A protein has these predicted regions:
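Active-site hotspot residues in diverse enzymes, especially metal/ion-binding acidic/histidine motifs
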Residues: 1-123
């Protein structure tokens, strides 16, 4: 997997995960289980850059790939645990340790340079 949104959309398609662009009132992105499949919604009008689209889509794929879902009644610690799992999946796929080591060895040593190199947001 590379760090371009088109590659992430292709990954989702191979995994039978529906990805749709939908305007939403509050959320920028969300994912839901649908029986034996998953669906992701992204609000393209809230995505300010390719890096943000990449990070949001990877995060939602992380929910799908780890089965980390919760409902509105879940306790905050449960929600955070599921969000952390999705973040961990996204980070491991967007910034593999070996590639991070190579980037640092090649001179990408600060957060802005690394985020640009990996096409991810700084946060």
């Amino acid at each position: 997997m590379t760090n371009h949104p088109l590659d992430l959309y292709a990954y989702a398609e191979r995994r039978n995960i529906d990805v749709d662009w939908i305007p939403m009132r509050r959320a920028t992105s969300l994912s839901v289980p649908l029986g034996d499949r998953y669906a992701i919604a992204l609000d393209p009008w809230k995505l300010g850059s390719l890096a943000q689209e990449t990070v949001c889509l990877a995060h939602e794929l992380g929910h799908c790939e780890t089965g980390s879902f919760y409902n509105q009644y879940a306790a905050l610690d449960v929600r955070q645990r599921h969000e952390n799992r999705a973040d961990k999946w996204a980070i491991q796929h967007l910034i593999p340790v070996e590639e991070l080591d190579e980037a640092v060895a090649d001179g990408c040593e600060d957060i802005p340079a690394l985020s640009e190199h990996f096409c991810v947001t700084e946060d």
